[in-house]
Amino acid sequence: GSSESRPVIYEGSLKKFVEDPEHVLEEATHERALLIAASGGKDFRKDATIYGDLMEEKPGIKWGMSIDMNSCYGCGACVMACTAENNVSVVGKPEVLRAHDMHWLRIDRYFTGNINDPESIQTVFQPMLCQHCDNAPCENVCPVAATNHSSEGLNQMTYNRCIGTRYCANNCPFKVRRFNWADYTGSDSFKNNQDEMNDVVMMMNDDLTRMVLNPDVTVRARGVIEKCSFCVQRLQEGK
């Protein structure tokens, strides 16, 4: 498929890349040249910025994650592991149908090939999580600075400062921020908010079930945004 005559995903083989590293960039470079010409010779995607000196590299550790998309076949095991490790609420299908899904990590699926040749259609899987952008667009729109940047390059959430404006979720280009519409896990202070919830949600409010939660990760409450933390608790343990 395509959008505005552009392919959804660019692909190239390792063999071709070794032979000609610039080959995989040819199509994207050509499209950018057309955009630059149409905008009077200025490459806004490369040169324009509202950050100024903030774009300069800062010394120190910068955490990142490398994902081999050639190996990913969309099994979802990483999603389950993330959910278990970070106490991500299991909200049930009815909540997902209302666009209240809570995954910190999701698997995006893209279809590529010739639409006139069904046999050529292939599926490309892409795990999608918070990219911890160097100059994150979610950070400068929060009125209470609940989301901020650490000295090690992590985009952090301060849950007890969040007032639930959801401006950050609206400004996230990767759509990886999740809002707690209800007290899905552990809270019993909003009984009226639990009347029509799916049974699987109510199970997580049971005292015994709460014992499966990871004690190293904060349990989020109703009305706050949450997202991938790059498993900061494990990074700290590794130090």
Feature map (PLM): residue ranges:
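Iron-sulfur cluster-binding cysteine motifs and their immediate structural context
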Residues: 73, 77-97, 106, 135-161, ...
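Long, contiguous, secondary-structure-rich segments that constitute the structural scaffold
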Residues: 1-64, 70, 81-84
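Glycine- and acidic
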Residues: 59-70, 121-130, 147-157, 210-213
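Active-site-adjacent "gating/activation" loops or surface patches in catalytic cores
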Residues: 42-59, 99-141
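Surface-exposed acidic, glycine/proline-enriched linker/cap segments
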Residues: 106-126, 193-231
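Internal, charge-rich low-complexity segments
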Residues: 182-198
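Short, solvent-exposed loop/helix junctions and linker helices
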Residues: 69-72, 132, 222-225
